[in-house]
Amino acid sequence: MSSNNSGLSAAGEIDESLYSRQLYVLGKEAMLKMQTSNVLILGLKGLGVEIAKNVVLAGVKSMTVFDPEPVQLADLSTQFFLTEKDIGQKRGDVTRAKLAELNAYVPVNVLDSLDDVTQLSQFQVVVATDTVSLEDKVKINEFCHSSGIRFISSETRGLFGNTFVDLGDEFTVLDPTGEEPRTGMVSDIEPDGTVTMLDDNRHGLEDGNFVRFSEVEGLDKLNDGTLFKVEVLGPFAFRIGSVKEYGEYKKGGIFTEVKVPRKISFKSLKQQLSNPEFVFSDFAKFDRAAQLHLGFQALHQFAVRHNGELPRTMNDEDANELIKLVTDLSVQQPEVLGEGVDVNEDLIKELSYQARGDIPGVVAFFGGLVAQEVLKACSGKFTPLKQFMYFDSLESLPDPKNFPRNEKTTQPVNSRYDNQIAVFGLDFQKKIANSKVFLVGSGAIGCEMLKNWALLGLGSGSDGYIVVTDNDSIEKSNLNRQFLFRPKDVGKNKSEVAAEAVCAMNPDLKGKINAKIDKVGPETEEIFNDSFWESLDFVTNALDNVDARTYVDRRCVFYRKPLLESGTLGTKGNTQVIIPRLTESYSSSRDPPEKSIPLCTLRSFPNKIDHTIAWAKSLFQGYFTDSAENVNMYLTQPNFVEQTLKQSGDVKGVLESISDSLSSKPHNFEDCIKWARLEFEKKFNHDIKQLLFNFPKDAKTSNGEPFWSGAKRAPTPLEFDIYNNDHFHFVVAGASLRAYNYGIKSDDSNSKPNVDEYKSVIDHMIIPEFTPNANLKIQVNDDDPDPNANAANGSDEIDQLVSSLPDPSTLAGFKLEPVDFEKDDDTNHHIEFITACSNCRAQNYFIETADRQKTKFIAGRIIPAIATTTSLVTGLVNLELYKLIDNKTDIEQYKNGFVNLALPFFGFSEPIASPKGEYNNKKYDKIWDRFDIKGDIKLSDLIEHFEKDEGLEITMLSYGVSLLYASFFPPKKLKERLNLPITQLVKLVTKKDIPAHVSTMILEICADDKEGEDVEVPFITIHL
């Protein structure tokens, strides 16, 4: 066995800077289990290498590959690590080095022979792909099943594919879904065990879940850690069984879901062939799984009869033979189709026609799916697929009227695209090559998209091209899933490196891919102008935020360009296809906004760790960013105070922060330590004592109910303890960040901070005693008026603050350095401070603390990500891409997809049709239609045109936020405007010139129809 010598992470350690986004998908326990797993992949055509790529990126102990067959030109259709120079060499040997580059922690080996099946004992998971015969798969599976080795099989043929999973007689699933354990506050527990949620909060539980309780008063025995099985009664209540013998419920209580491991049993491949268990990939094709189950078996039988050759492309003789084989199998395996179900000859014929094809989108779909099943097999995380799944995308085939498929048009032409030509035909391949496309973003989805496009040959023709843009640069945390990038690329521009990488994959793209580093938005409309958008065939988003997606979507609607949209969140992924005049747009439906945390909860009444983390991040922002920026503005902007006094925000807080920052400037690092220690006392001791002074622990509401009940947890002040890890790190990180603000050298070697050095400074400090403020009011509910709202300008307190500020002229040249929050730098103290600060506040309120990783996830608003989902989702997008190139107009041919690989779940639906409107008996598309006006028309002529040609009386006309015309304008204003061309009118009203790059303008109108009724109508596009 040959191998590479790669660096291994130490046992029990995970490189969080590399795996950070994946850790939030799998968790540390699963990652550590993966690091003890050796994986073998048999077959390194497109499917095998896609699986291997995703598994190596994920980080297993080792990867071994086996494929001694020589590289052929047609392999380049889907095997992205092969080049024409590799033709004739062994696929395994050539691919190993490329796989090894993906992850320095995963050694990649080549298995030299498969003659002795017992050598498989060294592996925990074996994956057999489409180069392995069914007979050999059965033999290998029998050995694996009896030896406790997890076995997975998969193969793709044209637009068809399947996978099979056998994880043995007894496999333990540790976490079926991967979702965060649900938790909630209880308002009541009845004797029969009915648990009711507090404040109409949904519990989110399902029948059969298990929960444990804490902080229940009255039913104290519930708090002993016992697990209770849940029976759901509704969204706000569930039952746990009788609790009569436990006593009587008084108040309080928190439930927490507990994931209980469960065992699953799998059957062998031999058993499953005749009596399969299916996971359905598309419920609209419910009946196809059984047909394809027989069809794929028949393909293997055909190959045995024909010296390993699969049916010839579009050959009816071979197709009829395959149908006969399937018919015979249906008799031998009657359980598969079931009684009275005939063989679907059209489906089997299509399988025969495409058997020699290899399509990047299908390969990417199964490559992501199977790789995730490998990770499940290694870790026990998520629910395995049980046991067969079949998939097809026959809707992707082009219209035979436009692109006829026959033996002649699908024959190989000695091209790297031959396996794609076998499915779609040569003419369609030419149309793919001559497409003009725009990819927005080259991160995880963008890299996968470009890889697939390189394999497709998209944009490689004489009339085709690809434009990709991304204004981001490569970071180490990207390398775990953005596979076109290597460690040497860190710091470089994503789009440029990605473009260079795919040109190396497919030299046909050289000179055909234009990499830009410009953000797509209103500020770059001079770059991405009218002529740019109008030249495109379609657009693909590879973005990670809603605002950018929405902007691109609006551009595509305006220019009537198809848009392929997709996104991932951990193991979840979605795809959406947007077609002009056919479907709704991305912006037509929006996710509900995130539920914000009430300010009163943050300020005074937190009850879970999310609240304390949000509070700590806000404190970080105030201490180290806002204060420094306010000081700098005060010192450089002469009218800063005057402008601040006019604002409705926290004027007093702004002025206090400036005063404190300038009057208490530290002179050395010891001063920074003292500042941090005093802030600890203020935030975690004095402020809590003040809160309890206002609302003692025995306080009652106006209704006579205990004030500290329900979601309000009575806090306790903290006494500083330098040997408490959170207390100490609040001071360490706080002092270091304050030193950064003031340009003071901190005690910031990367070594562990010395407790004794900090202690010697703190021991000599005088910590002020707490004195309650009887005049301080604390807001209890967000709906209540803020009792400490800003005093009016000119009040004594504000005047004193203003007069206390030093004259900026006495501080000429002085400047503070604001801290710019960066979550992924473990040496900058940012997450260290927020973690310590949040945990100290959690200790105040008896909330379970969180480690650095969880704090970073919440404070940094990190999106969990893993290469497997990205690969699968991109595959689905590329199957829709063929339909765009074919200009399909039947909405039923398109598919929007939602997947969750953790369950696993696959859902496909037709896109929602665009909404239609009507005026004066004229129907129009509310999204895609508009009134097109050519030339810089006069306002009066525009009004007349609508009256004569559309039967509409324009009552208002606007450009952006500027009102150009209204029927109620005074006669003088109307006279002034009616004779102006639109461009001059816009200039007059906005007092701005029309930019030179603008050749189209959008005008919004309000209009009355012939009956004088106000009607909704499309916008106007003026083509200059």
Curated annotation (Swiss-Prot):
Residues bound to ATP: R21, A444, D470, N478, R481, Q482, K494, V520, N545
EC class: ligase
Modified residues (Phosphoserine): S265, S914
GO biological process: DNA damage response; protein ubiquitination; ubiquitin-dependent protein catabolic process
Binding sites annotated in the UniProt record for Mg(2+) 2: D544
EC annotation from Swiss-Prot or TrEMBL: 6.2.1.45
Disulphide bonds in the chain: none
Described purpose of this protein according to its UniProt entry: E1 ubiquitin-activating enzyme that catalyzes the first step in ubiquitin conjugation to mark cellular proteins for degradation through the ubiquitin-proteasome system. Activates ubiquitin by first adenylating its C-terminal glycine residue with ATP, and thereafter linking this residue to the side chain of a cysteine residue in E1, yielding a ubiquitin-E1 thioester and free AMP. The RSP5-UBA1-UBC5 ubiquitin ligase complex ubiquitinates RPO21 forming 'Lys-63'-linked polyubiquitin chains.
PANTHER family the record matches: UBIQUITIN-ACTIVATING ENZYME E1, UBIQUITIN-ACTIVATING ENZYME E1 C-TERMINAL DOMAIN-CONTAINING PROTEIN
Full protein name: Ubiquitin-activating enzyme E1 1
Organism: Saccharomyces cerevisiae (strain ATCC 204508 / S288c)
